[in-house]
Amino acid sequence: MYVRVNAYILEGTNHLNPIASNSVKLNVKPYYIELKDAVPTMWYLVGNMFGAKWANDKNIGVDALPMFLKPNFSYDKKTGAGEIEYTNYFLTGDYNDKAECDGAGFKILPSDFNWDYSMNAILNNEISAKKGTIENRNGGADGGHIVASEAGYYTITINTADNTAKMEKYEGNVTNYGTIQIATSLDDFASDTPMLPYNTEGVENHAWYYVMEVPAGQTVSFKFKIAGSWDTNWGYGAADGAINMYGKCEANGHNIGLAEGKYVISFNDITGAFSIVKL
């Protein structure tokens, strides 16, 4: 490719004293960048409802638990914005004079763990908050702990495009499995490994998580199941080993694949949703 520079003095519409440089030959090497969809935006549950873990170390899967990507939701390919959710049993309790609630209180943090933009309960005044409410702090004054209006099953939904949130009662049927296991191809599905519960306050739990590290150069498959039996198990995908980062599991579905890396895998035994966050 050849290029040159043309210059002139502009006077009104006239081009005065035009001059052109010598031509210069350039060798151009095409450069290809594969465009990838943005990773969906995630928020993290912290607080007394979740073992009094407040993300002090900003350690996902340890002191901050991911919400769930929504099955069949089309996330914005450029920004990753969309809806995320979390369904489980929630305790309730009374606020202290700091709008905090022991045992049942919690907050929700954005992926950068910036408390100035956390999800909190709406304050009535400096010492009390409105149960069952959620709003984004949006850089303003701190809000209260989020607390269910009464004990029971709820779904929390966050729209990460406009950072709005709601907490609604869940009215569907619920089966209590007690524990949920994960089985993997690392030992040819021979053993069960207990997943960890989101709820740690001695109440029913239906959301589970497990931190998995897939060795370099390998792909691992896994399924969710009840303890000691394959009579009840869940999988997902078009074929065994297909890699999917979220979806709604099917009974006796396909093995879910994961490429090398470290992940937090979450599963909800009420909704069947699974969601994976790469660390």
Locate predicted features.
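Insoluble glucan recognition modules
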Residues: 1-279
